[in-house]
Design a protein with these regions (language model features):
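Catalytic cores of the polymerase beta-like nucleotidyltransferase superfamily
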Residues: 1-141
Length: 141
């Protein structure tokens, strides 16, 4: 995934400019890149699945609230995804503070993890979306 990240990132940005969400953009960019690679080289499915998974995990590093951080650090490929995130800092795609936060988060005890997540409340642009209730129409009979 590290070898192909720069091209995947460029493809992702082109999809974002077309109006796709961050997750859909990276999903399409990764699929397109892997199709190009498979025309010239042979990779086993398990390696292709790993590359795809590492790329898709990058979108989850933007979520600091709720259960997302806890489920991400339990993921089997979390450490590899964190290394890819560190590479993205060198490419100026991600702030170093993000990598430091995730590194500290996965190493600290559970009690501190809860405090870290609560400490991020209000600092991120994340907001929970709620469905708007529809008003009942009053009958005029």
């Amino acid at each position: 995934a590290v070898l192909f990240w720069e091209k995947i990132s460029k493809l992702k940005m082109s999809y974002i400019e077309q109006g796709f969400s961050d997750y859909i953009s990276i999903q399409r960019a990764t699929s397109e890149m892997l199709q190009d690679i498979n025309q010239n080289f042979y990779f086993q499915r398990k390696h292709i699945a790993g590359i795809r998974e590492l790329c898709l995990l990058q979108t989850r590093f933007n979520k600091f609230l709720g259960k997302s951080p806890f489920s991400l650090i339990r993921h089997a490929r979390f450490r590899s995804a964190l290394k890819l995130l560190e590479l993205r800092v060198k490419l100026n795609e991600v702030k170093i503070e993000t990598v430091v936060w995730w590194d500290k988060f996965h190493r600290c005890p559970d009690s501190e993890k809860i405090e870290m997540v609560n400490g991020m409340r209000g600092k991120t642009g994340q907001r929970r979306s709620y469905k708007k209730r529809r008003r009942k129409k009053l009958s005029t009979t």
